[in-house]
Amino acid sequence: MTESTSRRPAYARLLDRAVRILAVRDHSEQELRRKLAAPIMGKNGPEEIDATAEDYERVIAWCHEHGYLDDSRFVARFIASRSRKGYGPARIRQELNQKGISREATEKAMRECDIDWCALARDQATRKYGEPLPTVFSEKVKIQRFLLYRGYLMEDIQDIWRNFAD
């Protein structure tokens, strides 16, 4: 680290770091706080920023003010991204909880998203086990276990065979 960077005020260094972090992808406020608090890897190993709690709050407030940090946008994009990867609503809720998103914000975003979870569950099952889906009990149990692991709800999984029988 050069002398000029080490002389920069902690607020400026934190703000620069926050913008760099948020330029890569959206983060929740809690994720950003955790990453800002972590030591920076410099040429001579980890380096701490001598920042006060007020500096962290000012950086977070600045990011909110300028639209870099928005938990509702983060939640909507996260749900869309994880559902495209084949994960179900239960797993997505759990991951959002781990990222510090409130249950209310998660539920609101889940209601607003326009995703057919039953169709996604069926797509995942056919991708893994082929078309037509097996009707033998032991095979159905394997599919059910797989889909539960992926985070789909039991009612969506049961709808696969209900609709399949029609």
From Swiss-Prot:
It is found in: Cytoplasm. Gene3D superfamilies: Winged helix-like DNA-binding domain superfamily/Winged helix DNA-binding domain. Transmembrane segments: none annotated. One of its GO terms (biological process) is DNA repair. The keyword GTP-binding does not apply. It comes from Escherichia coli O157:H7. GO terms for cellular component: cytoplasm. Keywords: Cytoplasm, DNA damage, DNA repair, SOS response. Modulates RecA activity through direct physical interaction. Can inhibit both RecA recombinase and coprotease activities. May have a regulatory role during the SOS response. Inhibits DNA strand exchange in vitro. Its main location: cytoplasm. This is Regulatory protein RecX. Belongs to the RecX family. It comes from the Bacteria. InterPro entries: RecX_HTH_1st (IPR053926), RecX_HTH_2nd (IPR053924), RecX_HTH_3rd (IPR053925), Regulatory_RecX (IPR003783), WH-like_DNA-bd_sf (IPR036388).
